[in-house]
Amino acid sequence: MAAMVVGALRRGTATAGGSSRSFARSLPRPVSTLVVAEHEGGFVKPSSLSALAAAEAIGKDDNRVSLLLGGSGPGLHKAAEHAASSHPLVSEVLVADSDVFAHPLAEPWAELLRSVQHKGGYSHVIASSTSFGKNLLPRAAALLDVSPVTDVTSISEPRVFVRPIYAGNALCTVRYTGEDPCMMSIRSTSFSPTEAMSEAKVAPITQVDLSFLSEGSSGKSAWVNLKSQDTERPDLANAPVVVTGGRGLKSAENFKVLEQLAEKLGAAVGATRAAVDAGFVPNELQVGQTGKIVAPELYMAFGVSGAIQHLAGMRDSKVIVAVNKDADAPIFQVADYGIVADLFEVLDELLKKLPDKK
């Protein structure tokens, strides 16, 4: 009888132990998020503020959010002050003050991200899907031995995300089942930045320990220079109005007419890959799957046929106006307003009717 009781107790203990392990596995993991931010002119870039909005979508109540900035000089510290009051969820701003991080080279930044992750133990790491984020995230993920989730457009649960596939023609829901951290890049056009807080709440600013840096930290790449257009027009990725030209404009000279319209509207100028490949405009103006992803309030397309790769980069625009003499052009399938006409006649009429921007 005693043996039966002891056996039952042993079986009960074993079952209870298994249940406790199962229960432990089912417990929700604590959420903490590291946002890798970019800055310019002493301010956090809008794309990084969108990454903060994505962090809020992961968890609002129990989410410890740290924001990582790198670089050197007064601009970095001014940006850190801006970051400290940029979002109510930001609990700490981490600053890596070194000339090594003054330029967006993936090798030293990946080492920095690995070091910060090892010390912070974050459950999530977020970067915006900019050229910098796309370059950094895979390398850092490889160093941390995890698989990144890219181009996230929506967050359903802390580890369930939606991302576009097939050039934006389908949406895929993915669940991250790997080890921490869950690393992801987000489309900034899909997450609206939160308005700046009052100065009443300011997160502390902490210097990152850079003792991990060595002479080989810069890797096999070196910064050469940065070339940018000298223009007063807004940045293409964040402009509220975008005027885009395609191969139908026929020449670089005709793109100047489009630029006149952009000046009247206070808009950014974009281009299709065909226009870029033809040499009409530089490639930094390319909108599409392999160019800039935009979602302005107003998107005007002149002489754009609507190739699938181009539509992937602008289909989230609030209002789309298309002008093309081909009534069967695919661009009309996504346009809110379509004009089947000669684009040069339409441009001429618009330039006559629209007042100059003050």
UniProtKB/Swiss-Prot annotation:
Cofactors that this protein relies on: FAD
Keyword Lyase: no
Any single GO BP term: fatty acid beta-oxidation using acyl-CoA dehydrogenase
UniProt GO cellular component terms: mitochondrial matrix; mitochondrion
Localization: Mitochondrion matrix
The entry's keywords: Electron transport, FAD, Flavoprotein, Mitochondrion, Transit peptide, Transport
The keyword Hydrolase is annotated on this UniProt entry: no
Residue spans crossing the bilayer: none
Record's cofactor remark: Binds 1 FAD per dimer.
Main location: mitochondrion
Disulfide bonds: none
Gene Ontology molecular functions: electron transfer activity; flavin adenine dinucleotide binding
Record: residues binding FAD: 298-326
One Pfam entry name: ETF_alpha
Biological function: The electron transfer flavoprotein serves as a specific electron acceptor for several dehydrogenases, including five acyl-CoA dehydrogenases, glutaryl-CoA and sarcosine dehydrogenase. It transfers the electrons to the main mitochondrial respiratory chain via ETF-ubiquinone oxidoreductase (ETF dehydrogenase).
Family statement drawn from the similarity comment of this UniProt entry: Belongs to the ETF alpha-subunit/FixB family.
Subunit record text: Heterodimer of an alpha and a beta subunit.
Record-given protein name: Electron transfer flavoprotein subunit alpha, mitochondrial
Species per Swiss-Prot/TrEMBL record: Oryza sativa subsp. japonica (Rice)
Name of the gene encoding the protein in the UniProt record: ETFA
